[in-house]
């Protein structure tokens, strides 16, 4: 018999809210493993590296020195 036949459940990672879309305070924007995206203005990091908004506004992605940042503006 084979030793294959197993598969893990998907972890539903990725970007949940894209650029210029509205987000509410506490809203999850990105689920990730490690800090692929770093927190910018009005964004905090959860213990599993989830990025979430700390205030209402619109999502903005930017790259600074080859690092990707996510901010909430206006």
UniProtKB/Swiss-Prot annotation:
Pfam families for the chain: Ribosomal_L27 (PF01016)
Location(s) in or outside the cell: Plastid, Chloroplast
InterPro entries in the cross-refs: Ribosomal_bL27 (IPR001684), Ribosomal_bL27_CS (IPR018261)
Gene Ontology process terms (BP): translation
Top-level taxon of the source organism: Eukaryota
PROSITE patterns hit by this protein: RIBOSOMAL_L27
Disulfide-bonded cysteines: none
An MF annotation (GO) of this entry: structural constituent of ribosome
Primary localisation category: plastid
Keywords noted in UniProt: Chloroplast, Plastid, Ribonucleoprotein, Ribosomal protein
Any one annotated GO CC term: chloroplast
Family listed: Belongs to the bacterial ribosomal protein bL27 family.
Protein name: Large ribosomal subunit protein bL27c
Taxonomic lineage: Eukaryota, Haptista, Haptophyta, Prymnesiophyceae, Coccosphaerales
């Amino acid at each position: 018999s084979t030793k294959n036949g197993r598969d893990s459940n998907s972890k539903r990672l990725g970007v949940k809210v894209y650029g210029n879309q509205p987000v509410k305070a506490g809203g999850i924007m990105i689920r990730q493993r490690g800090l692929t995206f770093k927190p910018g203005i009005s964004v905090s990091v959860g213990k599993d590296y989830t990025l979430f908004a700390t205030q209402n506004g619109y999502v903005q992605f930017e790259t600074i020195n080859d690092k990707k940042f996510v901010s909430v503006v206006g």
